[in-house]
């Protein structure tokens, strides 16, 4: 299954230890933020992209914690060199 460039970027951040946090107002999602492993906010996540990743089962949350990458997400993301 192919994933878009934006999905690949987000999954790569999550694979390196990042997380996606959501804030709700009632039952609706008010805000979505993607944090890198260093604590910086990555601006490339919107509601549509978040729902695509959930639909593909690439991310998951358990017990109300932030969303993390799943094994399926690791399979979908192509490896990239980390220039650190």
Swiss-Prot record:
Coiled coil: none annotated. InterPro entries: YjhX_toxin (IPR018654). Belongs to the UPF0386 family. NCBIfam families: PRK13687.1 (NF010240). HAMAP family: UPF0386. This is UPF0386 protein NGR_c10980.
């Amino acid at each position: 299954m192919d994933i878009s460039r934006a999905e690949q970027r987000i999954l790569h951040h999550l694979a390196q230890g990042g997380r996606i946090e959501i804030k709700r107002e009632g039952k609706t999602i008010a805000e979505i933020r993607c944090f890198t492993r260093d604590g910086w906010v990555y601006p490339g996540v919107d509601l549509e992209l978040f729902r695509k990743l959930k639909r593909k089962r690439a991310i998951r949350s358990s017990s109300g914690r932030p969303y993390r990458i799943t094994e399926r997400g690791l399979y979908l993301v192509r490896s990239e060199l980390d220039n650190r």
